[in-house]
UniProtKB/Swiss-Prot annotation:
Purpose of the protein: Involved in iodate respiration. Probably catalyzes the reduction of iodate (IO(3)(-)) to hypoiodous acid (HIO) and H(2)O(2), using a reduced cytochrome c as the electron donor.
Co-factor: note: Binds 1 [2Fe-2S] cluster per subunit.
Gene3D superfamilies named in the record: Rieske [2Fe-2S] iron-sulphur domain
Family: Belongs to the AOX family.
Subunit and partners: The iodate reductase (Idr) complex is composed of a molybdopterin-dependent iodate reductase (IdrA and IdrB subunits) and two associated peroxidases (IdrP1 and IdrP2).
Pfam families: Rieske
Cofactor(s) essential for the protein: [2Fe-2S] cluster
Catalytic class of the enzyme: oxidoreductase
Official protein name in the record: Iodate reductase subunit IdrB
GO molecular function, a single term: metal ion binding
Organism phylogeny: Bacteria, Pseudomonadati, Pseudomonadota, Gammaproteobacteria, Pseudomonadales
Primary localization: periplasm
Length: 192
């Protein structure tokens, strides 16, 4: 048995007699990589390099889409806005949400087309989790409590959120926050 054992020997980093058996990283290489890493990370602190991106909002004609008294928690209401063929969902979530309106900030509206490849999200609202999806194409789901951000799946963009306002008991859509799938810019086409 002892014939098959290969002795292991320690090789100091400065021992040049054994080429190819150096330590995995020399002091010089460590300092070079460390300095490069610090330099690259500090670039983000330069003025104008790292900027906060603001969500783009397209303003449209104000349109009544529902009433506070008619909404029931967890029961979505479908509507079209800003064009007749753009399908959306209005829902009272029962929990506060980003961009929510009403006394509890729990009423939100979102477009019903997946931002990945435009799959239809009609009828996929899950009230117990406040999510929309999964998309029938690639199973993306969206969290409606967090501005429609992707909860899972292939999409990389949040769902376009319909900007709402309340006047008395009436709920109005006044704009779109984000880009609806299939449009290169929501302001390119005039509402019908």
């Amino acid at each position: 048995m002892s014939e098959n054992i290969i002795p292991v020997r320690a090789v100091p980093a400065h021992d040049h007699e054994h080429d190819g058996e150096r330590a995995c990283m020399s002091r010089r290489r460590f300092l070079l990589f460390g300095g490069t890493s610090v330099a690259l990370l500090s670039i983000a602190s330069l003025p104008g390099v790292a900027q906060v991106m603001q969500a783009l909002k397209a303003d449209y004609a104000r349109q009544r889409i529902g009433s506070l008294s008619a909404l029931k928690t967890g029961e979505p209401l479908d509507f079209n806005y800003p064009y007749p063929d753009v399908r959306n969902i209005l829902v009272k979530l029962g929990v506060a949400a980003g961009g929510g309106i009403g006394a509890d900030k729990d009423i939100v509206a979102f477009n019903q087309q997946c931002t990945h490849m435009g799959g239809p999200l009609d009828g996929t609202y899950k009230a117990e989790h406040q999510i929309l999806g999964p998309c029938p194409l690639h199973l993306t789901t969206f969290d409606l409590t967090r501005h429609g951000m992707v909860a899972s799946g292939h999409a990389t963009e949040s769902l376009p959120q319909i900007v709402l306002e309340v006047q008395g008991d009436d709920i109005y859509a006044i704009g779109v926050l984000g880009l609806v799938y299939g449009f290169d810019s929501m302001n390119d086409v005039q509402p019908a």
